[in-house]
A protein has these predicted regions:
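P-loop NTPase motor core
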Residues: 61, 139-217, 221, 375-454, ...
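Conserved P-loop NTPase
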Residues: 31-38, 126, 140, 158, ...
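Conserved nucleotide-binding/hydrolysis micro-motifs of P-loop NTPases
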Residues: 95-99, 107, 121-125, 169-171, ...
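Walker A/P-loop NTP-binding active-site region of P-loop NTPases
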Residues: 54-115, 294-354
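Pre-Walker A adenine-sensing motif
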Residues: 44-54, 287-297
C-alpha cells in the first residue's frame, strides 16, 4: 500500500496529484480534521511559553539558522518530548550519520534509542554525482527520485506523530530545479498533514532568502540566531518567531542558551503596570535622624534609589534597610553585581552589622550575580522565581552601574531595568537600587544613566568640603 500511495506522490501529473492524493488518504481512513486548541509540548524550557503552549498538531514548521545555532539539538529535544507523551518520532538526517547524532546526544545525557533515525546523508544515499545528472533524464524519470519517494514510504509505514527533516537545504539537491523542488515540498507538506504528522524542517537563512516559496508552504517559521556582542565579549543567542499560523505568540527576540541539558529559552515578557494596594507600612532604618528625614521611613512597595559617589556609604545604608526589614520578619534579598557574598559579610562585620544570624534564619539572602553570565531576561526570570516562589518582600540591587556596564551588551539597560521594576512593583515588593555617581563634589546629579524617573524616592549621599576637610551629607531629594 505504501508503494501505491507513493506512486501518487511521485509519478502522476502535478495538476491531478494534489486531488488524487487527498482522495487516496480518505480511502485509507485518514480524515482531514479542523485545527483544535490541542498543542504538542516542545519540551524546551521557555519555548512553550513563547508559542502559547507548543506546536499545533498537523502543522509544518521550519527552523532557520546558520550552522551552530542549535537547530539539530532543538529538533531532537522536541522529538524526545514526544516520546515522553507516547508519540512516535522520526528524525531524517540529510547531513549527519546516525552514529554521530547519537554520540553528540550522549554528551547531553540523551538516549535516542526511542527515536527512529533515518540516514539520508551522502554516504547512505550514494554519490551525489548520480543526482547531479538528473537534467539529462526525461521528467517522468526525474520525478521518481528515490529520496522523495522514500520519505513518503517511511511516513506511511511508520505513521509518526512527529517528524524532523534536517535539513531541507540538502533535500533541494534531489530535485532537478527550483520549480520541481517547490512542487515536491508543497505536496510533501500536504501529505504529512493528511497523515496526521507534525513536521519540523531545518534550513539556513540564505536558503530561505533564495527560495521564498518555503515561507508560504509552512505554517510556522522560527529563527535561531547567534551573534557576537557589541563589545565582542560574549556570544548572544536568541530565537524569534516570524510566522505562526493559527495561533498568537510572544513577539520579539527571546534569549536562548545551549546548556548541558539542551536548549533553554528565556521569554522576553514586557511587564504591565498594575495597581497594587499597599498596607501603609513603612520600612525603617532605625536610625532616628534618617527616619525623621524620611517622614518615618520608606513606604512598602515603593522603589528607592540611593545615589552618591564611591565611599559615601550607599551599600551600607541599603543593607541597613534590608536588615531592619528582616528583623521585622520580612524576607529580604540583595542582588550584588560587584561584591561577592564573602566581601559583603566582611564589610558588614567591620561596621558592627550582624548579618549572619539573619542569613542562617533565611530572612535575608545575599546573591552574587555576574551579569556577563546572564541575559537580562534570564536575570528577570531568576527574580520571578525568588520573589514569586520564595516570597521576598524587599529586594536591593547593588549596583546599577555594575548592572549597566555589563547588561548593555544586550541592548538598552534602562528598558530592561524598567521591566524589572515594573514586575517588582506589581508584586508589592519594596525595592532599593544603589547608584554610583562620578562627581565627588560640584553640580547635583541624581544618576548618570538617567533612570531617576523609575524611583519613588531618592536618597542622595554627597561629599562636602568645609575648612579644608572632607565630610559626608545625606538628603532626601524625592519622596512620593
Amino acid at each position: 500500500m505504501a508503494a501505491l500511495v507513493c506512486g501518487y506522490f511521485i509519478e502522476i501529473g502535478w495538476a491531478r496529484r494534489y486531488n488524487l492524493m487527498t482522495r487516496r488518504m480518505d480511502l485509507l481512513g485518514v480524515e482531514s480534521k479542523k485545527m483544535t486548541t490541542r498543542r504538542l509540548s516542545t519540551g524546551i524550557p521557555g519555548l512553550d511559553q513563547v508559542t502559547m503552549g507548543g506546536l499545533i498538531p498537523r502543522h509544518a514548521y521550519v527552523l532557520v539558522g546558520n550552522p551552530g545555532t542549535g537547530k539539530t539539538i532543538l529538533s531532537l529535544q522536541w522529538l524526545l518530548e514526544g516520546v515522553k507523551c507516547g508519540e512516535k518520532g522520526i528524525f531524517i538526517s540529510m547531513v549527519e550519520e546516525p552514529k554521530m547524532l547519537k554520540k553528540n546526544a550522549e554528551s547531553l545525557g540523551w538516549d535516542l534509542a526511542p527515536i527512529e533515525i533515518t540516514d539520508f546523508s551522502v554516504a547512505a544515499v550514494g554519490d551525489m554525482d548520480e543526482f547531479e545528472e538528473y537534467h539529462v533524464f526525461p521528467s517522468s524519470e526525474v520525478e521518481n527520485a528515490p529520496v522523495w519517494k522514500k520519505i513518503c514510504e517511511i511516513v506511511e509505514k511508520k505513521k509518526p506523530q512527529r517528524l524532523v527533516i534536517d535539513s531541507i537545504t540538502q533535500l533541494r539537491q534531489f530535485s532537478t530545479d527550483e520549480y520541481q523542488f517547490r512542487r515536491h515540498i508543497f505536496v510533501l507538506i500536504r501529505f504529512l498533514t493528511q497523515a496526521g504528522c507534525t513536521a519540523v524542517f531545518s534550513c539556513e537563512p540564505l536558503f530561505m532568502e533564495e527560495d521564498t516559496s518555503i515561507s508560504s508552504a509552512v505554517d510556522g517559521i522560527i529563527y535561531l540566531e547567534k551573534e557576537i556582542s557589541r563589545e565582542r565579549l560574549i556570544d548572544i543567542r536568541n530565537i524569534h518567531i516570524q510566522k505562526f499560523r493559527g495561533s498568537d505568540f510572544l513577539p520579539g527576540a527571546h534569549p536562548m542558551r545551549i546548556t548541558s541539558r539542551g536548549v533553554e529559552i528565556f521569554p522576553h515578557i514586557i511587564e504591565k503596570n498594575r495597581e497594587v494596594q499597599h498596607a501603609g507600612e513603612q520600612i525603617r532604618s532605625q536610625i532616628p535622624e534618617l527616619d525623621n528625614l524620611l517622614g518615618g521611613g520608606i513606604e512598602s512597595g515603593t522603589t528607592t534609589i540611593i545615589s552618591g559617589p564611591s565611599g559615601t556609604g550607599k551599600s551600607t545604608l541599603a543593607l541597613q534597610f534590608l536588615m531592619q526589614a528582616a528583623l521585622a520578619e520580612k524576607r529580604a534579598i540583595l542582588y550584588s553585581f560587584e561584591e561577592t557574598t564573602e566581601s559583603i559579610l566582611f564589610r558588614s562585620r567591620s561596621v558592627g552589622m550582624e548579618v549572619m544570624p539573619l542569613l542562617e534564619k533565611g530572612l535575608l539572602e545575599i546573591r552574587y550575580v555576574n551579569p556577563l553570565e546572564l541575559y537580562p531576561d534570564e536575570f528577570l526570570q531568576a527574580i520571578r522565581l525568588s520573589i514569586g516562589k520564595e516570597s521576598y518582600n524587599v529586594a536591593a540591587f547593588d549596583s546599577l552601574n555594575g548592572y549597566h556596564m555589563t547588561m548593555e551588551e544586550f541592548g538598552s539597560t534602562v528598558a530592561h531595568l524598567q521591566n524589572v521594576i515594573t514586575y517588582l512593583k506589581a508584586q508589592g515588593t519594596t525595592v532599593f537600587m544603589i547608584n554610583e555617581t562620578e562627581r565627588i563634589t560640584g553640580d547635583l546629579r541624581m544618576t548618570e544613566a538617567g533612570i531617576s524617573f523609575l524611583a519613588d524616592n531618592i536618597i542622595l549621599l554627597r561629599y562636602i568640603e568645609q575648612m579644608g576637610r572632607i565630610g559626608r551629607v545625606m538628603g532626601c531629594v524625592k519622596k512620593r
